[in-house]
Amino acid sequence: MFAPLLKKLFGSKNERDVKRMAKAVQAINALEPQMVALSDEQLKAKTAEFQQRYAKGETLDQLLPEAFAVVREAGKRVMGMRHFDVQLIGGMTLHDGKIAEMRTGEGKTLVGTLPVYLNALSGKGVHVVTVNDYLARRDANWMRPLYEFLGLSVGVVTPFQPPEDKRAAYAADITYGTNNEFGFDYLRDNMAFSLDDKFQRELNFAVVDEVDSILIDEARTPLIISGQAEDSSELYIKINKLIPRLKRQVEEVEGKPSEEGHYSIDEKTRQVELNEQGHQFIEDLLSQNGLLGEGESLYSAHNLSLLTHVYAALRAHTLFHRNVEYIVQGDQILLIDEHTGRTMPGRRLSEGLHQAIEAKEGLPIQAESQTLASTTFQNYFRLYNKLAGMTGTADTEAFEFRQIYGLDVVVIPTHRPIARKDFNDLVYLTQEEKYAAIITDIKQCQALGRPILVGTASIESSEYVSKLLQQAGIEHKVLNAKYHEKEAEIIAQAGAPGSVTIATNMAGRGTDILLGGNWEVEVAALENPTEEQIAQIKAEWQKRHQQVIEAGGLHVIASERHESRRIDNQLRGRAGRQGDPGSSRFYLSLEDNLMRIFASDRVKNFMKALGMQSGEAIEHRMVTNAIEKAQRKVEGRNFDIRKQLLEFDDVANEQRKVIYHMRNTLLSAEDVGETIKEFREETLNATINQHIPPQSLPEQWDVEGLEAALYSDFAVRLPIQQWLDEDDKLYEETLRSKILEQIVAAYYEKEELAGAEALRAFEKQMLLRVLDDLWKDHLSTMDHLRHGIHLRGYAQKNPKQEYKRESFTLFQELLDSIKRDTIRVLSHVQVRREDPAEEEARLRREAEELAKRMQFQHAEAPSMEQAVAGEDEELPEGPAPVVPLEPVRNEQKIGRNEPCPCGSGKKYKHCHGQLD
């Protein structure tokens, strides 16, 4: 009630933040005459002075006004660019560990130099994170002269970089790279066999460019390093042939599903589900083709992997379309980033989905993979001591940034007022009418000499618009995932008078469209251009630039609304940069995906009430509001998916931290002898407790079993029964001590034979190997657990709580297994003298061989809607298409003929007992 009044009196939080920083800007401006008076050498010397002052106890906040003034002056001298006051505010926002929302063309790259320089003074390193390798290299090369003038080193990390180059890049004061490469290097570091093989230092400060794209759009999908698993390509091919025989269950007019069909598709959640008829039909087909035993159920425990293959193939055929979600290049499937329209070479979908698409397209099927290490961007970026980001559009996602990352969004004022006109959406009944209107708009703008940018949501749409323009005889350029090697050339001239550029999702392109075209690209195309040629090109560009401004600037046409308002705003933001004129218009139809799935009924009824005819459009704020409401619905759903992914990964993340800490401790330890000693005693006590329970009577002891277990775990044959027969004074505790003495003595014999130094090195390497192997298996088990955990909802249990409980049990078992397996390997190994350095070199060679076979995936996010179905939503009918882990039983086993605890009334063997 009082919020509007308080806001009027005191301003919004954003206004107060900007006002507070404006005072600091005055202090920086006051230092400018002092900096101008310094010679180049004196200005360079400021860096060493700041570093000394920091070492003596001054904080970075105290150094900020002078440091920013130094960077501003260096920018003028080295690059001919002076930071505006609003850019100083942006720099302070980033230094404070916040997100700066700055409009397109406001110079985000230059803004980044301010906090990057300041934080690099600490000597702990700064990471500048971009969305692709091209931008990482471009920005690093662009800003390198400025940083090097000030005495700071700059490095760039890229995929397939030689290890020594990558190590040098991370050792630099400032390191540029992509979010994927930083994330994968973190995972690779935690698979290293030596401290010398690690790349990254402490994760100190990261500035994330296009922060919304990296921390939100890509947060649904985990980073995975995987190795090859068993080959099942024949199975994919056989099942692929059966899927086209299944029919989709369509909805009738009333919204109820018809009885015809085998499966239904939920387009909102991108899930596909076999119905009862479909289950029976596919089981019959599998039986006829010899893939399923006669009378067997697809849901029997030993057939669950077959079920996974069926659902993977079904999703490949129904949810993934060529030239929309992926393209075929040679004999490979290249995924398309839905947010940027770029292809993602090297990325593969998980859970057999990529192989299913390869089978669908008749391509060679690459072997499935097994997860070796994984994390999410959410958990990786939260490892940094301080995180900041910048983007043109963050305010719509401010709540998520705050809740997930603890980052506030500050909207930075523009240097010049925005002069762009954003027209209301035009909504047509059909796509055909919509595209006809788009062509008409293009012709009108071209006649005026205005450049036009047409934004589409898929390659298919971009190629359709291109076809229509060809038929209309309009010259144009196409920028989509198929042709992005020509990207820079196309973008450079997208602002030329009358030019028409079709772009698939301009988000994340990272290049401004300059009105009149880009004269620097024209100069670069010449061989050894003279001063006269450069001056002539500049003059011609100035004439074109003025011509485009007078015509009304760049006109942005969008062929449909994206799921996210933010992506729409990014497309709009391509026009009207730095106060230039421009305009934008969205053309929609009731047949568009977003309208059809989320907003069609209400808008359709409204349009019918108006008595709209074919070819007519509606332009009304109510329609635009209805569409934005639909977008907010989608954004909310996507936020829930990301939040649920994080909640599940948080459980794994705590375990990941423990394992990685254990691993780093081992790597930095010169001697793990004490650790091995502890493992030996704990393993021995566990083995003895299993056969001689604490405080038990001798009659309860399983001596024969203990003798066998000791040989299995410690490779020693001990006559325990003989000891007990010969010595009446032996009881539980003294027996433990005697067994330990014998085991230690046997191990010391091994040490004398191999040499203490060699055995210590071997212990360390073997412990690392056991830890890695078991962690890899644990990740696979956790995957299966997560994918099947929603089934617990049938038994009225909370899937999230069940996941936490069972994953904790699994982790305890993992820690016990690491101890037991390490001792077992060390006890059984036959030792011979070998140089520790040779052993380490051999292990490193093996690790390099493994690295060659690794795959780096930013895999499709596993769906989490079903995982929380037990909490908020109605459970789906029938089990989901995933492989559940067999539950760890802490409760009493249920008899097969007893009633099922889920409350269905069926016998357990006919209900959930089929999964046991």
UniProtKB/Swiss-Prot annotation:
It catalyses: ATP + H2O + cellular proteinSide 1 = ADP + phosphate + cellular proteinSide 2. The keyword Membrane applies. Residues 857-916 are annotated as: Disordered. May bind 1 zinc ion per subunit. It is a peripheral membrane protein. It is found in: Cell inner membrane; Cytoplasm. One of its GO terms (biological process) is protein targeting. Its EC number is 7.4.2.8. Keywords: ATP-binding, Cell inner membrane, Cell membrane, Cytoplasm, Membrane, Metal-binding, Nucleotide-binding, Protein transport, Translocase, Translocation, Transport, Zinc. Its cofactor is Zn(2+). The keyword Zinc applies. Residues 906-916 have a biased composition (Basic residues). Its main location: membrane. InterPro entries: Helicase_ATP-bd (IPR014001), Helicase_C-like (IPR001650), P-loop_NTPase (IPR027417), SEC_C_motif (IPR004027), SecA (IPR000185), SecA_CS (IPR020937), SecA_DEAD (IPR011115), SecA_motor_DEAD (IPR014018). ATP binds at residues 87, 105-109, 512. Monomer and homodimer. Part of the essential Sec protein translocation apparatus which comprises SecA, SecYEG and auxiliary proteins SecDF-YajC and YidC. Part of the Sec protein translocase complex. Interacts with the SecYEG preprotein conducting channel. Has a central role in coupling the hydrolysis of ATP to the transfer of proteins into and across the cell membrane, serving both as a receptor for the preprotein-SecB complex and as an ATP-driven molecular motor driving the stepwise translocation of polypeptide chains across the membrane. Belongs to the SecA family. This is Protein translocase subunit SecA. The gene is secA.
